Swiss-Prot record:
One of its GO terms (molecular function) is identical protein binding. The gene is Prdx3. Its main location: mitochondrion. It catalyses: a hydroperoxide + [thioredoxin]-dithiol = an alcohol + [thioredoxin]-disulfide + H2O. The modification N6-succinyllysine is found at K84, K92. This is Thioredoxin-dependent peroxide reductase, mitochondrial. Gene3D superfamilies: Glutaredoxin (3.40.30.10). It comes from the Eukaryota. Housekeeping-type gene preferentially expressed in murine erythroleukemia (MEL) cells. Residues 64-222 form the Thioredoxin domain. The modification Phosphothreonine is found at T147. Disruption phenotype: Accelerates decline of physical strength; at the age of 10 months, the physical strength is much lower than in the wild-type littermate. Increased oxidative damage and decreased mitochondrial DNA copy number in skeletal muscles. Increased apoptotic cells in the brain.
Amino acid sequence: MAAAAGRLLWSSVARHASAISRSISASTVLRPVASRRTCLTDILWSASAQGKSAFSTSSSFHTPAVTQHAPYFKGTAVVNGEFKELSLDDFKGKYLVLFFYPLDFTFVCPTEIVAFSDKANEFHDVNCEVVAVSVDSHFSHLAWINTPRKNGGLGHMNITLLSDITKQISRDYGVLLESAGIALRGLFIIDPNGVVKHLSVNDLPVGRSVEETLRLVKAFQFVETHGEVCPANWTPESPTIKPSPTASKEYFEKVHQ
């Protein structure tokens, strides 16, 4: 019975994926090259919004967990306009913000990447590197970087763009939409020992907050350094809590006068 149900499920998924593939193929025949990526994105977002089962992620096979070691990764990246082999080991002793985005030459993605790049120095000031990952090739990354921002490109980058053309990194981090072949907007904060401190995943149409990511990095570092915990909406200028029943009253008396 279970085997028959499994075959029926996979048959349904295959039919759905095949229908999407035919739709994409038909559109690319009829449309010019410049509009093909738009067509693909529209189809994927529409299906994702409808919650179709064909757009299941790989998270059922492997999901990174907070407090656990981050999955190892290795790939070719664009760093300061050059190609470089990069791995998780390169970030030992540093914090790492690893964030995934769907595709190069799209719409929300450049706003996120440019925003992180513009804040790169603030991340560096707290011993944190930022790496953006998509399933595009490193050649595509470089072409996008060489495209002016006013034309939807990235321009000069102060952060690294990593290629996941095999989709293995996205799969290992549990953010790959398997049948669509692209990653959701997953973001992982990894500490200097390679341990995941935070993870979040957005659906395709909504971008993330760079300021909130930086705030979280600073909060985790504060806890490690001072042994106190950070309340809601904490910033480096705001009070923290001593984690004990008696000592914590100092904080609560201060904020609830």
